[in-house]
Regions:
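Helix-loop-helix hairpins in multi-pass membrane proteins, especially solute transporters
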Residues: 93-224
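12-transmembrane solute porter fold
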Residues: 33-49, 54-56, 75-77, 84-88, ...
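Transmembrane alpha-helical cores of Major Facilitator Superfamily
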Residues: 45, 76-80, 107, 130, ...
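Hydrophobic transmembrane-helix bundles of small-molecule transporters
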Residues: 183-298, 303
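Hydrophobic alpha-helix/TM-entry signal in multi-pass membrane transporters
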Residues: 36-40, 102, 109, 125, ...
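Small-residue hotspots at the loop-to-helix junctions and early N-terminal turns
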Residues: 62, 66-73, 161, 318-326
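Interfacial helix-capping/hinge residues at the ends of transmembrane alpha-helices
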Residues: 55-59, 144, 178, 307
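Cytosolic juxtamembrane N-terminal segment immediately preceding the first transmembrane helix
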Residues: 1-49
Length: 332
């Protein structure tokens, strides 16, 4: 047996290192992941655009549909159903894989957009918003599952950063673009224009999801039945939040009854779904969840009602209102 000389070993190590250096690092835009990355990030961008841009069109839509008194329900309808959609999507993805909840979520989101964009009455507009929320909740969680299954661990931070950018960019340009569309084409186009744009991202992403992320997340060990307790808790959160919103809109004494029922449903259900210690800001995940909830709630409240005030009370156009609303929100 011949023992390699030191110089031979050094040459072999040097050659191996040079090969590693020469090989290009795999990224989320490499050939193997390009179609999937572009497709799912585009879906996130479209959902983010609709979520951030709708506040600009809402004051005009509510005024034309004679539904300013129901204005808040157009937002609460979306968020309450999205809460249920997110929990149900997690259960569905664990047991059947992310493809089904993703496709159903996108279909529901598109249907809700069409319902809202073609609504002739405020109640139908709110129904469309609720369907949008259900679809949005299904999609968001399913996309996270896709990331966990389709990408290696070293690429997941990059695709999650792309998701974050997919929310940041529409939040900056979306309200202004929505205001211009509302002012020059009409508020309905803010809603009915999105379903057409989602076709191409779906065509890119779905074949890749089917080949890379199909099937139950747990494989053969995945639970066969849904977790009924969590689904009931999510439904209780949605119903409780809806009843509480209804009671807050009606200042008569009779509204105390639905308000009390809403609190009775909402508080225990939220305690059952959130990490233990969230309400006392316990160290770790509970405090993160609490702070994110407070920050998101404040931001959404400002983005929802400041444009309404600027359009109805200050006479600003839908194009100018987002800029003023954004500056006020940034100052807060």
């Amino acid at each position: 047996m011949t023992v390699p000389e030191p110089r031979d070993t050094e040459v072999a190590v040097s050659a191996e290192a040079s090969l590693r250096t020469a090989a290009p690092a795999e990224t989320v835009l490499s050939r193997a992941y390009r179609a999937l990355s572009v497709g799912i990030v585009s879906v996130v961008v479209l959902i983010a655009f609709e979520a951030t841009a709708v506040g600009t069109a809402m004051p005009v839509a509510a005024r034309e549909l004679d539904g300013v008194s129901l204005y808040a329900f157009a937002f609460s309808g979306y968020f309450t159903t999205s809460l249920f959609g997110m929990v149900f999507s997690g259960q569905w993805s664990d047991r059947r894989g992310p493809l089904a909840p993703l496709t159903c979520g996108i279909a529901s989101f598109a249907l809700g957009l069409v319902l809202s964009g073609t609504a002739g009455a405020m109640w139908l507009f709110i129904l469309g918003r609720a369907v949008q929320g259900l679809g949005g909740g299904l999609v968001v969680v399913a996309l996270y599952v896709v990331v966990g299954r389709a990408y290696p661990e070293r690429l997941r931070p990059a695709i999650m950063a792309a998701f974050a950018a997919g929310w940041v960019v529409p939040s900056v340009v979306g309200p202004l673009a929505s205001g211009a569309v509302t002012e020059h084409l009409g508020w309905r186009w803010v809603f009915v224009g999105i379903p057409v744009l989602v076709v191409l991202p779906l065509a890119l992403a779905l074949p890749q999801i089917r080949s890379r992320a199909a099937g139950p997340v747990g494989g053969a060990d995945a639970p066969a039945s849904f977790d009924g307790r969590r689904i009931r808790l999510a439904l209780a959160v949605s119903l409780g939040a809806g009843l509480l919103q209804y009671a807050a809109q009606d200042l008569r004494w009779v509204s105390l009854l639905p308000g009390a029922v809403g609190v009775a449903l909402l508080v225990p259900a939220v305690l059952g779904l959130l990490p233990r210690g969230t309400y006392r800001a316990a160290r770790g995940l509970p405090s993160v969840v609490l702070l994110r909830g407070v920050a998101a709630g404040s931001f959404v409240a400002a983005e929802s009602f400041v444009p309404l005030m600027l359009v109805t009370q200050r006479g600003l156009s839908p194009t100018l209102a987002p800029g003023r609303a954004g500056s006020r929100t940034g100052n807060v």
